[in-house]
């Protein structure tokens, strides 16, 4: 019964966010995976909230309106919206329609350097529209369909298959971005190096979060931390 409620409504309590404290949502990953997947058919709106996991939204039928970072985006069928970790957003649903909504553990995928670097480009959100990028949108949507099939199945090695599909989803997006920005990557090597080192720093902190940390312990962090503090100081003075 719980699986059917999750599949139909995206919640075991239709019409509300399950674990919401003020504007903070705690995502309950189910079935021992690092994702929470909804095939949502509700006409209920979701108030302003945020959560540590990232989020992917893609309408199947009808539109879906998301307000994030001061912008309101109306998604059309097979558009794909990626919302970065920690971003405040609200959702307005139409009277009818269906859509995929998926939360994913950022820390789980941050263990892979490629993914950590890619996730740094998601802030505050990334939008792929079928009108502007039909091939990319269709590829990403097809992977979401496969994830749904595994998530609500009883297949053995389901978790492994879901994680493989998630990596495939992000790899498709990342390779597309790399092709689109290849000239920019060559023009701005310093920024790319900072992004790579920042991803390494995030991964190091994630892997040693129970230890006493300092920049002296991990020398590569020294220059990067100084760069970040200088940038923050300039913004503060401005």
Predicted regions and their residues:
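N-terminal positioning helix adjacent to the helix-turn-helix/winged-helix DNA-binding module
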Residues: 136-139, 190-201, 237
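Residue-level recognition of alpha-helical structural elements
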Residues: 136, 154-162, 194, 211
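N-terminal regulatory/effector-sensing and dimerization cores
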Residues: 31-123, 153-160
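A hydrophobic/aromatic-rich effector-binding and dimerization subdomain
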Residues: 2-36, 88-152, 171-184
């Amino acid at each position: 019964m719980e699986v059917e409620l999750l599949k139909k409504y995206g919640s075991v309590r239709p019409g509300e966010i399950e674990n919401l404290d003020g504007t903070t949502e705690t995502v309950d990953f189910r079935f021992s995976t690092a994702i929470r997947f909804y095939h949502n058919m509700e006409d209920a709106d979701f108030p302003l909230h945020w959560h540590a996991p990232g989020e992917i939204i893609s309408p199947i039928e009808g539109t879906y309106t998301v307000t994030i970072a001061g912008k309101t985006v109306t998604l059309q069928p097979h558009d794909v919206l990626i919302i970065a970790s920690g971003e405040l957003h609200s959702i307005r649903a139409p009277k009818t329609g269906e859509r995929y909504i998926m939360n994913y553990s950022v820390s789980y995928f941050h263990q892979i350097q490629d993914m950590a670097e890619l996730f740094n480009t998601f802030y505050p959100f990334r939008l792929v529209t079928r009108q502007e990028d039909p091939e990319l949108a269709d590829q990403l949507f097809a992977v979401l369909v496969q994830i749904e099939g595994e998530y609500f199945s009883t297949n053995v090695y389901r978790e492994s298959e879901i994680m493989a599909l998630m990596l495939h989803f992000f790899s498709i997006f990342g390779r597309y971005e790399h092709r689109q920005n290849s000239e920019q990557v060559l023009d701005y090597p310093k920024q790319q190096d900072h992004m790579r080192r920042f991803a390494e720093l995030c991964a190091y902190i994630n892997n040693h979060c129970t230890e006493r940390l300092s920049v002296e312990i991990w020398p590569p962090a020294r220059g990067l931390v100084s760069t970040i503090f200088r940038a923050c100081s300039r913004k503060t003075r401005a």
